[in-house]
Curated annotation (Swiss-Prot):
CDD domains: IMPCH (cd01421). This is Bifunctional purine biosynthesis protein PurH. The IMP cyclohydrolase activity resides in the N-terminal region. It comes from Rhizobium leguminosarum bv. trifolii (strain WSM2304). InterPro entries: AICAR_Tfase_dup_dom_sf, Cytidine_deaminase-like, MGS-like_dom, MGS-like_dom_sf, PurH-like. GO terms for cellular component: cytosol. It catalyses: (6R)-10-formyltetrahydrofolate + 5-amino-1-(5-phospho-beta-D-ribosyl)imidazole-4-carboxamide = 5-formamido-1-(5-phospho-D-ribosyl)imidazole-4-carboxamide + (6S)-5,6,7,8-tetrahydrofolate; IMP + H2O = 5-formamido-1-(5-phospho-D-ribosyl)imidazole-4-carboxamide.
Length: 538
């Protein structure tokens, strides 16, 4: 049976007479304490916060003086006391609560300013197990939750960004806060503790290799509110989880306006793809539109990689996202600004390149500070009606697979390189995906079709259009390798690929009709390998 409320009406304005300040992040805390002192508010504090306030010459009382109990166990126990929690939780207009406060010498606390041990930062920095556990805050969340529950009477501040609004209200209302403000701060407080606990629970699951915990909570901190979502009638916001994986959520915006919902989604897809190519081995460029690649290439230089990626489908690249695996240089920047582009993301940007990009002030330029590790473990999540689908990140790499030649003809060394290149790209194309590649360059990409044959045909059509635009006698699919991200269920898909000019095929295998497909390949002298790994993407 649920706990029954006494339904005592909450007052609109509550005067702040006593405040408890206990923070790890001391940004603005002395200034806040000064403002409270000027309003005649009694200050209570703990540990380092107490020292900072006292050092500023402000009158402050250590919490241990009102509890009559010292801080013990290396600070693990300092505010977990009835005097503190009674002062936060007491319903001021309840006679029974008032009597209990008098009986036990409990004073009301009207304001709590609390923030937490930096568990997220310690986890992100890869702290060892004991250090990470030690940075799990106990007293802080308890006080936050107690204060937020009793927001009818208590104001809770958990974010230094709210101090200015609070002090303005305090000055304007004669040292009082409004109920609407207290409600809003309470909602924010519970969101903060929920996100904090989510990070802790997910860290434990990761540390203990628990793949399917009984409860899975994914938390995030608001990074920005957006003008709209995927479409103008949808509301949207961008939340960051605290994971330090280089990419769109951690990158610095060097120029350009705020990224849109679609910009963020597409930029993430682009950067995750280009990270498949080691920068120390070769420069690479990926051009993305609607989260699908329209051109990917490597080259002897970054500018050559860009030109080759653009050549695959220069029409679709218009208004796209460009991702690079090396520092953006001036020569590449000069080429990029010739085309209307939404976003460029790279590990770094030279000063010369910045000056060139600045000629296009609406072009968003992101410096990610590094590349994400495509082999790193992690989670992805997708919402469905009433649920959340959570899975491990697709970190399978074709270089790590044992490829099985299943045809009479084995691929040449060049065909094998092209196969691996195409399969890398196919991993990042919406299913059904077919990718033709030749000499480290996509020749044609077919994405998102219900029929794999249609994806193969679209990819071939794109190659034909590119050949016309470039003045080539034949499409680049002639003599190419082709990748399918999932098995070929029938020989018709293979025959379509052969008709486009492919000489080698890479696919996961695993169809009931694998032998039928193999026989068709042998009949046409095609080399085919199985990877044993599928890369569906939806």
């Amino acid at each position: 049976m649920a706990v029954i409320s006494k339904k005592i009406p909450a007052p609109d304005k509550v005067e702040i007479k006593t405040a408890l300040l206990s923070v790890f992040d001391k940004t603005g805390i002395v200034e806040l304490a000064q403002a409270l002192s000027e309003q005649g508010v009694r200050l209570l504090s703990t540990g380092g916060t107490y020292k900072a306030i006292a050092a500023a010459g402000l009158a402050v009382t250590d919490v241990s003086e009102i509890t009559g109990f010292p801080e013990i166990m290396d600070g693990r126990v300092k505010t977990l006391h009835p005097t503190v929690h009674g002062g936060l939780l007491a319903i001021r207009d309840d006679s029974e609560h008032q009597e209990a406060m008098k009986t036990h010498g409990i004073e009301a606390i009207d304001l709590a300013v609390i923030n937490l041990y930096p568990f997220e930062d310690v986890r992100a920095a890869g702290g060892d197990y004991p250090t990470t556990v030690e940075n799990i805050d106990i007293g802080g969340p308890a006080m936050i939750r107690a204060s937020a529950k009793n927001h009818a009477y208590v104001t809770i501040l958990t974010d230094p960004n709210d101090y200015a609004e609070f002090t303005e209200q305090l000055s304007a209302d004669g040292g009082k806060t409004a109920y609407a403000f207290r409600q809003r701060m309470a909602a924010k407080a519970y969101a903060r503790t929920a996100a904090y606990d989510a990070v802790i629970s997910n860290w434990f699951a990761e540390a203990l290799s628990i793949d399917t915990p009984r409860h899975r909570v994914i938390g995030g901190a608001l990074k920005e509110e957006m003008r709209y979502g995927e479409n103008p009638h949808q509301k949207a916001a961008f939340y960051v989880t605290g994971e330090k994986r280089p990419g769109v959520s951690t990158a610095a915006l060097l120029q350009g306006k705020q990224l849109s919902y679609n910009n963020i989604n597409d930029t993430d897809a682009a950067y995750e793809l280009v990270a498949e190519f080691l920068p120390e081995k070769e420069p690479a460029c990926a051009i993305i539109k609607h989260a699908n690649p329209c051109g990917v290439a490597t080259g002897s230089s970054l500018v050559e990689a860009y030109r080759r990626a653009l050549a695959c489908d220069s029409v679709s690249a218009f208004g796209g996202i460009i991702a690079l695996n090396r520092t953006l240089d001036a020569e590449t920047a000069e080429e990029i600004v010739k085309l209307f582009t939404e976003v460029i993301i790279a590990p770094d940007v030279t000063e010369e390149a910045k000056a060139i990009i600045a000629r296009k002030p609406n072009l968003r330029l992101l410096s990610a500070g590094g590349l994400p590790d495509p082999r790193a473990a992690g989670l992805t999540a997708k919402t469905v009606s009433g649920g959340l689908l959570v899975q491990s990140r697709d970190n399978g790499m074709v270089e790590d697979l044992e490829l099985k030649v299943v045809t009479k003809r084995a691929p040449t060394a060049q065909e094998l390189d092209d196969m691996k290149f195409a399969f890398k790209i196919g991993k990042h194309v919406k299913s059904n995906a077919v990718v033709y590649a030749k000499d480290g360059q996509t020749a044609g990409i077919g994405a998102g079709q219900m029929s794999r044959v249609d994806s193969a045909r679209i990819a071939a059509l794109k190659a034909e259009e590119a050949a016309k635009a470039l003045g080539l006698a034949v499409p680049m699919t002639h003599g190419s390798a082709v990748a399918s991200e999932a098995f070929l269920p029938f020989a018709d898909g293979l025959l379509s690929m052969i008709a486009a000019g492919a000489t080698a095929v890479i696919q996961p295998g695993g169809s009931m009709r694998d032998q039928e497909v193999i026989d068709a390949a042998d009949e046409h002298g095609i080399a085919m390998v199985f990877t044993g790994m599928r890369h569906f993407r939806h």
